[in-house]
A protein has these predicted regions:
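Terminal accessory/targeting
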Residues: 1-48, 52-101, 111-227
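Beta-strand-loop-alpha-helix segment that lines the small-molecule cofactor/substrate pocket
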Residues: 103, 107
Length: 227
């Protein structure tokens, strides 16, 4: 028998979430646009994607969003073992999206990278930011953590706001200005893939602004093992 929850993370289910929000008069914004508008706490929907792995699937959300004429923010890793953001496969897809109004940002666990490579923390972050900035027009970042992460970069980010501004980072995605104004909805493992705390549909019913965080490697078109 098919698991009743097995279609929760299909592209069809994702498009249904967006359509539900549109039907309930939500306005879609990138993270940058949300901050530029003063972080409104009602009827705004942010689609945030942390691109962790599975490069062949990097635009699975973007393709769905194009169909429904909404825009999102994708945070991209530079220093990692899973993909090259400047590859022949990944870069054209993300650059095309940026030209269409999608936002690209940096996704990084630079503290962990520093610990494992002996590159100073500030140098690691600056180098990642400069590398991605050379290919995309970026303004923000989000901190990355693997399931088995050893070091968390977020505390360092929160304590070094002036340094972030100095190298050109205008915002970080876990800023209180964002989190205090939205219902934060995301998928995760508990122990299997599920929605944490609440589902997108439950959040939409409240009328409050929503930040929906998703990860491309957990989503699929037809079934979870298609790639």
């Amino acid at each position: 028998m098919k698991n009743a929850s097995s279609d929760l993370f299909s592209v069809t289910a994702y498009k249904a979430i967006i359509q539900n929000a549109l039907d309930n008069h939500y306005v879609f914004m990138t993270v940058k646009e949300f901050l530029d508008k003063g972080s409104p706490d009602k009827k705004v929907f942010i689609l945030r994607h942390d691109f962790d792995k599975k490069p062949e699937n990097c635009d699975i959300f973007i393709n769905a969003e194009r169909e429904l004429n909404v825009r999102s923010t994708t945070y991209v890793r530079v220093a990692n073992n899973d993909y090259n953001p400047f590859s022949y496969i990944v870069y054209p897809k993300l650059k095309k999206a940026e030209k269409e109004g999608f936002e690209i940002g940096l996704h990084s666990n630079f503290v962990e990278y520093s610990k494992f490579t002996d590159i100073p923390i500030k140098e690691a972050l600056t180098s990642e930011w400069k590398a991605l900035s050379a290919f995309f027009n970026i303004e923000g970042m989000s901190c990355h953590r693997d399931i088995n992460y050893s070091y968390n970069s977020l505390p360092w980010v929160e304590e070094n706001d002036l340094f972030l501004k100095k190298i050109g980072i205008k915002y970080q995605a876990y800023d209180k200005k964002i989190l205090d104004s939205v219902l934060y909805v995301n998928e995760g493992l508990n122990p299997h893939l599920c929605w944490r705390n609440m589902t997108p549909q439950e959040a939409i019913k409240t009328g409050k602004s929503i930040c929906l965080l998703t990860h491309n490697h957990w989503w699929y078109y037809d079934h979870p093992f298609e790639n």
